[in-house]
Each structure stands twice: as structure tokens, then as C-alpha cells.
């Protein structure tokens, strides 16, 4: 499609209102309803609620102040976010998986003055952290059915302290009442909303995300409206051949992450109808909704590939058979999965970026892709490699510095203003970027050899039997590894080989050893894995071993499984 009309930088709420006259009666969102039905939300209804909520927010926030949102995906999540931005504020998403302590840290550190929250479990975490949230003026409940007294009672039953209920009542307001406040202001002054949006500068922050660092507390990353708008325009330019105005999107990625928020904003720009789903329902919704747009993480693409057993007709049944614009993000995707979908006529686009870059730096694209790379730099992005191979970035989508952390900001930029990504990379002869490792994850063996563990671990990415490998061996004579298996494929292999129950453990170890031997044959002797341990505990976000963006927390793995890994040197 011709994306030219959408390339001019603008604040995100403008995407809804600039095209509202022609879209008002059309459907923006489809929400799951009981008995498998869907409930529609029109562009007009969506826009009206943004307008009302923005005028409520204007009464609670001064220009440039921050509002946090702590909720799973729902239309009100996006309504609140765009309302805050339209009012000149900064939206601060909080991951739904955050504990009460983590939630308190982000809200307190961000200086949030307004908090949007949904679901009883999340509101209970807010109440549990109440003593740390003194700077929050108002808590807005996204669902009117959420009962503060019941949440307080639930904490009492668990023996946790609860703030006085009178204080809760004073600071908490339900969604409908907040909308009513905004509607009253709108009736008093019909020009107030437009004045507020017109006053927002592209160069002021509109979004602040917290990095899910593999160690240490998260850092606040303020992004200006221009940062995000320029990155969005690059996405449009690169993917134009796959884009359609008014497409059907199946939206399930958390909007608290930049990937999911970006998908929702792209839908606002291009007039998509987005069916809202969640991790438990998305595989069932795919063949029902039959989307042309679908963005996901590697684990789900891999589930689809395994379920199809390589049969293209079966794959079409599982996905609805109309996929056109598809992205995979958060971690690397196995090559065999990319090749399977490509045979089915679907290019799974991968790229590379980080929160500090709004977020994308490189993308594979319809007219230029390599499955062994993360693509070429975006049109507005400059990349170069430092002497040690670290990827350095510069451009209008790169942020200006961390919130309240000048020391970290200084450490993140070179003296001549390039952002240090912390990743080691290389360019192919035809200009595609390949990621080799995280700079800080370099291991130095007892023999003085510098080893990039990811360069070894990534060689297992396409292995059907192995989910993850984490290499260990800093200051040691040789390398060992923790191995997480793919239960379904290993089980199928054992059944196919008719392995007796008593021999299963030995057969599994032999299988893993063969896979490791195959990779070792491609490595220098000092890079080879000499011993391994199979870990049964799940490597997931919920287990605390992956960040919300699916990066391995090496320090946490060392804490939990270090004894088992160290024992391999004594075996």
C-alpha cells in the first residue's frame, strides 16, 4: 500500500482523531464475549472515551507529569494511554507479571501522579504497596465491577496490612465516574480537548518504559513523541508491501510491552479491526478470526509449527489461512520455523532493537531478508561497530537519557553521542546485521580465552529437541551447560524409538549428547561444551528466569542452578 499519507510525525492520539470522520461508524475492536461471541467497539465510541478521559486526566495532571497503567490488555488500557498523551502527560506501563514490590518501584521511581489499574489480583498488589504510593493522587479502576472493599478484605485475610478504607475511597475512582468528570468538562468547553492536543510538542516525552534488565533494578526510559513517531514511520516504509488499510489483526501481546503497544498504535494509524485475545485463548482464536495481521513471540510460532507437523494445509487450518503481515519478537526464532512459514507464503519478520531506541533498529523486510540475520538498519537509523564489535546506534528514534539516572545515561553513550547497545554484532557482506552476544555476557576462561556464550547457545536455536541452552564457565578450564528440553518432541522421539520406561533417562541423555556433539564439531576446542545438566524447572517469565522480553537472566540461573553446574566440574 502507499504509506505516504501516514509518514508525517504526530502524537499517537492524532492517529485516531485525524481519520475519525471517515472511520467513526466502523469497528475498531472486537472483544470476546460469553458463548464464543464477539462484542464490537466502534472508532467513534473509542474516540469519545479518549476525549472524555483526556479531559479528566487534565484535571489531575499538570503538563509532563506521569500516569502509570497496571492492567492486562483491554480497550480501556489503550484509551487511558492515549488520553494521558493527548492531555500532555507521559504514560508509564507496568508489566502485569510485576510483584507488589516491583509495581511499587516503577510507580514510585517514575513519580507517577495517576494510576490506572484493573483486575482484583493487580489491585490487591497496589493496595499491598500503598505506603510507597503517596505521590499518586488518584487510582482509576478500569472496570467498574472491581470492588475495593473486597480487595482490602482479601489482603486482610492473608494477614497483610491495608490502608484505611476511607483513604482508599478518597483516592480511588471508577472508570465511569472519571469519564463523567471528563464529559462534564467537555460540555463546559468543547474546544478544551483540541487545545490540549495542540499544546503537546513532538519533542516532549509521551511514553516511559522500564527496561527489564537481567540484573539490577529496572531503568526508566523516557521516549518523546518524535522518537516513537519516527520509528513508526520507518516500520511503515519497510513493510509497505505487506500492509493494508482496514486489515484484521489478532492482538494479544501485552500492551505494557513496547511490541504490543506498537502493534495497537499501528492499528490506530492504518484503521485495523483488532480482535482482542490473551495467551490462553489466542491459539483457539486464530482459526476463528482468520487475521491477516498477527504479531507474536517465538514460542507461539513454534507451537504452530509443531502442531502442523510440517503440513502446509494443516498450518493454514491452525492460523486461518489469511496471514500476511507477521512479526516475531522478543527472542530469536528457530530457522526451521521461519522456513516452514515461508513455504506457506508467510514471511515471519524479525528485527533487532531495544527500548532505548523506540524500539527498532533493524528489520528484515519483504524485499530484503536473510533468515540468519536481524535485517538491515531502518531508514532513519545509523549503526556502526566499535572496535570490540559492540553495536552503536544513532538517530532520531534514540532516547535522550534515563529517568533520574545521569550516571547510567553517561555510561550508555559514547563521547561523540552514539548509544552503546551492549550487544556484539557483525555485518554480512550484503549489509545485514547478525547478533553474536551480549557484551557483558562475555566469559573469560581460566586459560584467558574470551567466549561469547550466545554464539554457542544460538547454534541450538533450530534444534527440535532442545528449548534452551545456557553456557557456564567463567574462570573455569572448560565450559559446561544447563539444558532445557522440548518435552513434546522428546516424548515423540522416545515413542517412535519404542524406548522402554526403564531406559528413558539414559536415552534422553544420549540424545542430548548427540545434539551437543554436533554443535561442538563446529566450534573451537575451547568453546566446546564438555558436560551438561538437564534442568526440569521451567525457563519462563513466571519462574523468574526470563525477563518479560524473554531474555535469559544469567545471574538468576547462576543463583538457582550454579551448584548443579559447578558440580559438573567435580564429576
Language model regions located:
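Conserved pre-ATP/AMP-binding loop-to-beta segment of ANL
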Residues: 25-27, 166-210, 217, 242-248
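Conserved AMP-binding/adenylation subdomain of ANL enzymes
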Residues: 229-248, 253-314, 322, 347
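Conserved AMP-binding A3 loop
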Residues: 40-44, 198, 206-232
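Gly/Ser/Thr-rich phosphate-binding loop
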Residues: 170-175, 249, 292-296, 304-369, ...
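Conserved C-terminal "lid"/linker of ANL adenylate-forming enzymes
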Residues: 172, 468-470, 515-571
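Conserved ATP-binding/catalytic segment of the ANL
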Residues: 377-380, 384-386, 390-445, 462
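Structural core segment of the AMP-binding/adenylate-forming
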Residues: 58-59, 89-180
Amino acid at each position: 500500500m502507499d504509506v505516504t499519507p501516514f509518514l508525517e510525525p504526530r502524537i499517537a492520539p492524532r492517529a485516531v482523531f485525524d481519520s475519525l470522520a471517515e472511520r467513526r461508524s466502523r469497528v475498531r475492536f472486537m472483544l470476546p464475549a460469553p458463548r464464543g461471541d464477539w462484542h464490537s467497539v466502534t472508532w467513534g465510541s473509542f474516540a469519545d472515551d479518549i476525549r472524555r478521559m483526556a479531559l479528566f486526566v487534565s484535571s489531575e495532571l499538570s503538563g509532563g507529569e506521569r500516569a502509570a497503567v497496571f492492567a492486562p490488555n483491554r480497550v480501556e488500557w489503550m484509551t487511558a494511554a492515549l488520553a494521558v498523551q493527548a492531555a500532555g502527560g507521559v504514560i508509564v506501563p507496568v508489566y502485569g507479571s510485576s510483584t507488589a514490590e516491583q509495581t511499587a518501584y516503577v510507580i514510585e521511581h517514575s513519580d507517577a501522579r495517576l494510576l490506572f489499574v484493573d483486575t482484583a489480583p493487580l489491585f490487591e498488589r497496589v493496595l499491598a504497596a500503598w505506603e510507597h504510593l503517596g505521590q499518586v493522587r488518584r487510582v482509576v479502576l478500569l472496570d467498574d465491577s472491581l470492588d475495593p472493599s473486597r480487595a482490602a478484605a482479601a489482603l486482610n485475610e492473608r494477614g497483610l496490612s491495608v490502608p484505611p478504607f476511607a483513604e482508599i475511597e478518597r483516592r480511588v475512582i471508577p472508570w465511569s465516574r472519571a469519564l463523567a468528570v471528563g464529559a462534564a468538562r467537555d460540555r463546559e468547553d468543547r474546544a478544551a480537548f483540541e487545545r490540549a492536543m495542540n499544546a503537546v510538542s513532538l519533542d516532549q516525552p509521551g511514553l516511559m518504559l522500564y527496561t527489564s534488565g537481567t540484573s539490577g533494578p529496572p531503568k526508566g526510559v523516557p521516549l518523546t513523541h518524535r522518537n516513537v513517531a519516527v520509528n513508526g514511520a520507518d516500520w511503515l516504509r519497510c513493510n509497505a508491501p505487506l500492509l493494508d488499510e482496514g486489515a484484521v489483526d489478532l492482538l494479544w501481546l501485552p500492551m505494557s510491552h513496547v511490541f504490543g503497544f506498537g502493534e495497537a498504535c499501528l492499528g490506530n494509524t492504518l484503521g485495523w479491526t483488532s480482535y482482542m485475545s490473551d495467551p490462553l485463548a489466542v491459539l483457539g482464536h486464530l482459526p476463528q478470526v482468520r487475521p491477516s495481521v498477527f504479531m507474536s513471540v517465538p514460542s507461539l510460532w513454534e507451537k504452530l509449527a509443531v502442531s502442523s507437523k510440517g503440513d502446509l494445509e494443516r498450518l493454514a487450518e491452525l492460523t486461518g489461512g489469511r496471514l500476511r503481515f507477521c512479526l516475531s519478537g522478543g527472542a530469536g526464532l528457530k530457522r526451521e520455523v521461519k522456513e516452514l512459514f515461508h513455504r506457506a507464503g508467510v514471511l515471519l519478520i524479525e528485527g533487532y532493537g531495544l527500548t532505548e531506541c523506540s524500539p527498532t533498529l533493524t528489520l528484515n523486510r519483504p524485499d530484503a531478508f536473510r533468515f540468519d540475520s536481524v535485517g538491515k538498519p531502518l531508514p532513519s537509523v545509523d549503526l556502526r561497530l566499535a572496535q570490540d564489535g559492540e553495536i552503536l546506534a544513532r538517530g532520531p528514534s534514540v532516547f535522550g537519557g534515563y529517568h533520574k539516572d545521569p550516571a547510567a545515561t553517561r555510561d550508555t553513550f559514547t563521547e561523540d553521542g552514539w548509544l552503546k547497545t551492549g550487544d556484539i554484532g557483525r555485518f554480512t557482506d550484503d549489509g545485514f546485521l547478525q547478533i553474536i552476544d551480549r557484551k557483558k555476557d562475555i566469559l573469560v576462561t581460566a586459560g584467558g580465552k574470551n567466549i561469547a556464550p550466545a554464539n554457542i547457545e544460538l547454534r541450538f536455536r533450530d534444534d527440535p529437541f532442545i528449548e534452551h541452552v545456557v553456557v557456564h564457565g567463567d574462570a573455569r578450564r572448560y565450559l559446561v551447560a544447563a539444558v532445557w528440553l522440548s518435552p513434546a518432541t522428546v516424548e515423540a522421539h522416545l515413542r517412535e524409538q519404542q524406548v522402554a520406561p526403564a531406559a528413558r533417562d539414559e536415552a534422553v541423555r544420549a540424545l542430548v549428547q548427540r545434539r551437543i556433539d554436533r554443535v561442538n564439531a563446529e566450534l573451537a576446542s575451547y568453546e566446546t561444551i564438555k558436560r551438561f545438566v538437564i534442568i526440569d524447572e521451567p525457563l519462563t517469565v513466571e519462574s523468574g528466569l526470563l525477563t518479560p522480553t524473554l531474555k535469559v537472566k544469567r545471574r538468576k540461573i547462576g543463583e538457582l542452578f550454579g551448584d548443579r553446574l559447578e558440580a559438573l566440574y567435580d564429576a
